[in-house]
Curated annotation (Swiss-Prot):
Protein's UniProt keywords contain Ribosomal protein: yes
Organism in which the protein naturally occurs: Bordetella avium (strain 197N)
Family: Belongs to the universal ribosomal protein uS4 family.
Protein name: Small ribosomal subunit protein uS4
Example GO BP: translation
């Protein structure tokens, strides 16, 4: 299955919540009508959604939020099941540990898609070595740096300025002048993906 390249607002409207697919430079309310489903008139059916349908929606939220396709998502779930602890929380921590997501959290990209592009264009170093695989998992203590040749890109500076105005997450440490950051640890569950019920995702894959 190919990666979705259509309108980003459409995905957020479908899930009824902000999936953080658009830059925060403008309020999402000015771009997307989250209370209206995609389509000419939206979906007005009052039919109750089945448990399976609700579980599927929660999975779709996570996949779309982090830009992950089904095959890769299943791998993350299998790894989360293999590890000790709460499977749903571990799944989200794995998604948060993806290189493209950490680049986004550090403010080098204004969206995960933009951060993924920086990685694929070899603009990012991980522990002093060029890293071009967006799905790489970052570990606590790993250092991420914008490569010298990419530091002149205006979009990176703009993204850093935007991140500084919004607030850098506490689980990463960033030196915006040097365009480098350290991944301190995976975030606490309460700090991320607050509109997602990951227990439903676990139930879906346990069917």
């Amino acid at each position: 299955m190919a990666r979705y390249t259509g309108p980003k607002c459409k995905l957020s409207r479908r899930e009824g919540t902000d999936l953080f697919l658009k830059s925060a430079r403008r309020s999402l309310d000015s771009k997307c009508k989250l209370d209206s489903k995609p389509g000419q008139h939206g979906r007005t059916s009052g039919a109750r959604t089945s448990d399976y349908g609700l579980q599927l929606r929660e999975k779709q939220k996570l996949k779309r939020m982090y830009g992950v396709l089904e095959k890769q998502f299943r791998k993350y779930f299998a790894e989360a099941e293999r590890r000790r602890g709460n499977t749903g929380e571990t799944l989200i921590q794995l998604l948060e540990s993806r290189l493209d997501n950490v680049v986004y959290r550090m403010g080098f990209g204004s969206t995960r898609a933009e951060a993924r592009q920086l990685v694929s264009h070899r603009a990012i170093e991980l522990n002093g070595h060029t890293a071009d695989i967006a799905s790489m998992l970052v570990k606590a203590g790993d250092v991420i740096t914008v490569r010298e040749g990419a530091k002149k890109q205006a979009r990176i500076r703009e993204s850093l300025d935007l991140a500084a105005s919004i607030g850098i997450p506490q689980w990463v440490e960033v030196d915006s002048n040097k365009m480098t950051g350290t991944f301190k640890s995976p975030p606490d569950r309460a700090d991320v993906a607050r509109d997602v019920n990951e227990s439903m995702v676990v139930e879906l894959y346990s069917r």
